[in-house]
């Protein structure tokens, strides 16, 4: 059975996230809504995706991030067959850095 992601509750959560104004507000919000391990797992996946885009090996990624090869494989599958969400994030971060 496939879970439906597009729900009113998820929309409401995303609206709250989109309303955050700066990094400090993000820390405040995410420290309340996520456990430390959940937040660290999300950030680990993002770092893994960045390193995969930089053509790092699974061994290099595992050593630097502590991610399992299963996690690295899942992130790699998302990069190759997903909705391009990671790339959208990377592009926007890059644009923000270019403007500074």
PLM regions and their residue ranges:
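Active-site anion-handling motifs in enzyme catalytic cores
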Residues: 17-21, 27, 100
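Long, compositionally biased
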Residues: 53-60, 92-100
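Residues at alpha-helix boundaries and the short loops/turns that link adjacent helices
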Residues: 20-24, 36, 55
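Short, amphipathic alpha-helical "recognition" segments used to contact nucleic acids or chromatin
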Residues: 42-56
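General nucleic-acid-binding
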Residues: 1-20
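Short alpha-helical "recognition helix" segments of helix-turn-helix
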Residues: 60-65, 72
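C-terminal structural segments of small proteins and small subunits
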Residues: 69-96
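Short, Lys/Arg-enriched anionic-surface-contact patches
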Residues: 25-44
